[in-house]
Amino acid sequence: MNEQAKLERVFAYPFGDIYGNYVAKVERKGHTRDELDDVLGWFIQLSSEEIHAAAESGKTLREFFSDLSLTPHAELITGKVCGVRVEEVEDELMRRIRMMDLLVDELARGK
């Protein structure tokens, strides 16, 4: 499978599935869904209700991010996810997904 096909496979993943995984991860680490919603809400500029509606909508990650404006401070999000520096990810959509992953990882670790 070539690199673009791998990206397209990720982009087609339902946001609701990712959100469910995020909830399980932060709760396993002693944090709450509300804390997760606060972090995601800051990043993607949505309320908890809007995040929940998006999770239930069946939207893919591509569809989910196409409707959003990120925080104006998104460029300050730096670090590694799965050994990859998020600020160096070339594909804009994948960079946004990796930034979201990084924020959830940091919440789970208590940062």
Set out the residue ranges of the language-model regions.
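A charge-rich, low-complexity, intrinsically flexible signal that marks solvent-exposed coils, linkers
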Residues: M1-K111
